[in-house]
Amino acid sequence: DSEFAELKIRGKIFKLPILKASIGEDVIDISRVSAEADCFTYDPGFMSTASCQSTVTYIDGDKGILRHRGYDIKDLAEKSDFLEVAYLLIYGELPSGEQYNNFTKQVAHHSLVNDRLHYLFQTFCSSSHPMAIMLAAVGSLSAFYPDLLNFKEADYELTAIRMIAKIPTIAAMSYKYSIGQPFIYPDNSLDFTENFLHMMFATPYTKYTVNPIIKNALNKIFILHADHEQNASTSTVRIAGSSGANPFACISTGIASLWGPAHGGANEAVINMLKEIGSSEYIPKYIAKAKDKNDPFRLMGFGHRVYKNYDPRAAVLKETCKEVLKELGQLDNNPLLQIAIELEAIALKDEYFIERKLYPNVDFYSGIIYKAMGIPSQMFTVLFAIARTVGWMAQWKEMHEDPEQKISRPR
């Protein structure tokens, strides 16, 4: 039987359908309120508003649960690889062995970008931020695929594959250009993560051998960042896509949103904060500063808009961080890790943070891992974009397949 919520406005009662979720909270359908009640709902930041129905990702922030297509994020991070998770998000189920092989071959086949794109890179000054270069390059792909300016349903899957394949190449090119080194072409004999590391760190005169511990760590990072419900950048991609904009333009809007320090740039802010603290002996001082409303200092890497429990991604990354630093001989002498571990221990016992449910989030340890890998801080958000492209494309595809979706137009 259908359930309804009652909304009383100026003495008149309106019955609003309650939509049953397959998992998680039920939802009150307010889509007819403006037409029937002659008023709108007001929800700054969409704190209590669902903009779509989605089966891609589920989060229970109170319990610290994150699932992709029903699979727990910890299981995926430990037992899967990034392209298998990409297939899961795009198609809705894990691939068979044959499907996985075909998918990885297609991604490898489309990893090259048009050579004319090199001219675009040359228009940027050498000090340009890699995110600025990447943003322009991804948007410019529209010029190389004019047939997708008027895309069809038959184009969805190939478009997703092209995007997943080309973003790492563009990301590595952005980095190489920013440091004045020649571009390195993709090597299709390598898997997805190895290939990206190869394009980042190889040079024409030296071969780069990928450390398997580093590769596995980056694979986990990519999986952990692949999708996260209707966050700012994903919502931006959906809003752009709702107008019928071509997929390259949509993904470039997601990159722009991700670039914001409150979204994709948070792990770089964590590194800067740990450097500012400087030593474990100063942690109590900075804890006090974080509690002081009049002090501009903020404890970065703690708290999350959705999670009111320990971010499950942070738990995986904490152990991954230790594995990487142990492999590199830095486990016992990395000052940033020591400060981070002690800061977390102190904060989790402090009533101020406990009452406010401020737990470490995904950004708290990822920057330390990147830094240990030799990835500079200006590339942190670029790597986030590589991973999140999978989620953006899954959500973009789902949006276009949803008959209820309309052009987004907030009031």
UniProtKB/Swiss-Prot annotation:
The active site is at residues 304, 363. The keyword Iron-sulfur does not apply. Pathway: Carbohydrate metabolism; tricarboxylic acid cycle; isocitrate from oxaloacetate: step 1/2. It catalyses: oxaloacetate + acetyl-CoA + H2O = citrate + CoA + H(+). PROSITE patterns: CITRATE_SYNTHASE. It is an enzyme of class 2 (transferase). GO terms for biological process: tricarboxylic acid cycle. The gene is gltA. Keywords: Transferase, Tricarboxylic acid cycle. Its EC number is 2.3.3.16. It comes from Rickettsia japonica. Belongs to the citrate synthase family. GO terms for cellular component: cytoplasm. Pfam families: Citrate_synt. This is Citrate synthase. Citrate synthase is found in nearly all cells capable of oxidative metabolism. Gene3D superfamilies: 2.20.28.60, Citrate Synthase, domain 1, Cytochrome P450-Terp, domain 2. GO terms for molecular function: citrate (Si)-synthase activity. The lineage of its organism: Bacteria, Pseudomonadati, Pseudomonadota, Alphaproteobacteria, Rickettsiales. InterPro entries: Citrate_synth-like_lrg_a-sub, Citrate_synth-like_sm_a-sub, Citrate_synthase, Citrate_synthase_AS, Citrate_synthase_bac-typ, Citrate_synthase_sf, Citrate_synthase_typ-I.
